[in-house]
Regions:
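Membrane-water interface regions at transmembrane-helix termini and the short interhelical loops
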Residues: 10-14, 40-42, 84-93, 107-128, ...
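Membrane-interface helix-loop-helix modules in multi-pass membrane proteins
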Residues: 1-47, 189-192, 199-223
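Internal alpha-helical transmembrane segments of multi-pass membrane proteins, especially GPCRs
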Residues: 123-126, 173, 204-211
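Small-residue-rich segments of transmembrane alpha-helices in multi-pass membrane proteins
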Residues: 1, 56-65, 128-142, 209-215
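Helix-boundary and loop/linker segments of multi-pass membrane transporters
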Residues: 56-61, 160-166
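Hydrophobic alpha-helical segments and their helix-loop junctions in multi-pass secondary transporters
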Residues: 76-79, 83, 96-100, 104, ...
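Hydrophobic alpha-helical transmembrane segments
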Residues: 67, 164-180
């Protein structure tokens, strides 16, 4: 989750106005899709755990294999990016080799997943969410304490937030399509969809998560 502190600002700086709004929207679109399709898919496959299982039921074995391969490639790339971020950040703030921290985290994660499975992942996700919220509150508090609102607006405009160029619109549309298409294959979303208590829980979680993701990316992009 370390990307959330730097990526929105980078997108806003290089992509200008449309891009940051597109990036914020792309963070919410997976939850919009889950809100619409999640309850239906979960009802059709009550004992399911992944999107690939649903695809196999509806479209056959070949389609299931294609979805599984794409999901493995995507999740593998995502995992590499996460560990690369961890390694980079720890080497930037300490003298400890980042690769050692990444290995420690990987081994610890594998250990509790092998022992307790998805329930352990769900529990640690909740702890991580509390930590991320606390970190964001600290960052935003420091940010607002050091800058007046008028200064924030001035800096944001100087960074191109109010510049709406054609290339920025094209880039924003590309980001929305690319991120949404990729996140569909994130098995974490579907595991949580299938494990939800009922359709109401899926929709409530989608609304809260979607709004939270959109506002967080937008605020950090402006900052």
């Amino acid at each position: 989750g370390l990307w959330i502190l730097t990526s929105p600002a980078e997108v806003a700086w290089y992509g200008l106005g449309y891009d940051i709004y597109g990036y914020a929207l792309s963070a919410a679109t997976p939850f919009i899709l889950i809100y619409i399709f999640g309850p239906k898919i979960a009802d059709l496959l009550p004992e399911g755990a992944t999107l690939a299982q649903f695809v196999e039921t509806k479209y056959g074995n070949i389609a299931q294999k294609i979805v599984s391969i794409v999901a493995v490639i995507y999740m593998g790339a995502f995992l590499i990016a996460e560990f690369a971020s961890i390694s980079f950040v720890f080497e930037s703030i300490s003298s400890v080799r980042g690769i050692l921290i990444s290995l420690l985290i990987a081994i610890t994660t594998l250990a509790y997943l092998f022992r307790h499975g998805f329930k352990a992942s769900y529990f640690t996700d909740r702890l991580q969410s509390y930590g991320i919220i606390l970190l964001l509150v600290i960052v935003l508090t420091i940010w607002l304490s050091q800058n007046r609102l008028s200064e924030i607006v001035t800096f944001a405009n100087a960074g191109g937030l109010s510049s709406f160029e054609t290339f920025s619109l094209k880039s924003a549309l590309a980001v929305i399509i690319a991120v949404t298409a990729a996140e569909v294959f994130s098995m974490g979303y579907w595991q949580r969809t299938f494990s939800a208590e009922n359709s109401k829980a899926i929709k409530q979680a989608s609304i809260i998560s979607g709004i939270g993701a959109f506002l967080t990316i937008l605020i950090l992009g402006i900052g």
